[in-house]
Amino acid sequence: MKWTFKNGKLVTIKADKNIEVFKKYFEKISGEKDRIGRFIIGLNPEIKPQTIFDMMALGAVSIAVGYNKDIGGRNEATAHHEVTISNATVKIDRETIIENGKIKL
């Protein structure tokens, strides 16, 4: 899945499969569903992917959009959606900061 953000808002969603299912789910959410709610870079080499803590595993990236008041945020929405990706690539302003799970900074 590829999410593209501009000014903190989700502007495009692409996926190889099941994109229509996700879009139907996403359309039903109201409020600030397209605002970044959480962004986590996993730094812990002791945590393995596919566990309850996989968002903290070294090389993982977790990003959520929508509701985040439960963690001190300001986004008001009827839900939030979070994706955790192992060996992720993250670009900010066209600069790659994480490539295949390796921090480039």
Where are the language model's segments positioned?
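Metal/cofactor-centered catalytic core regions of large enzymes
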Residues: M1-L105
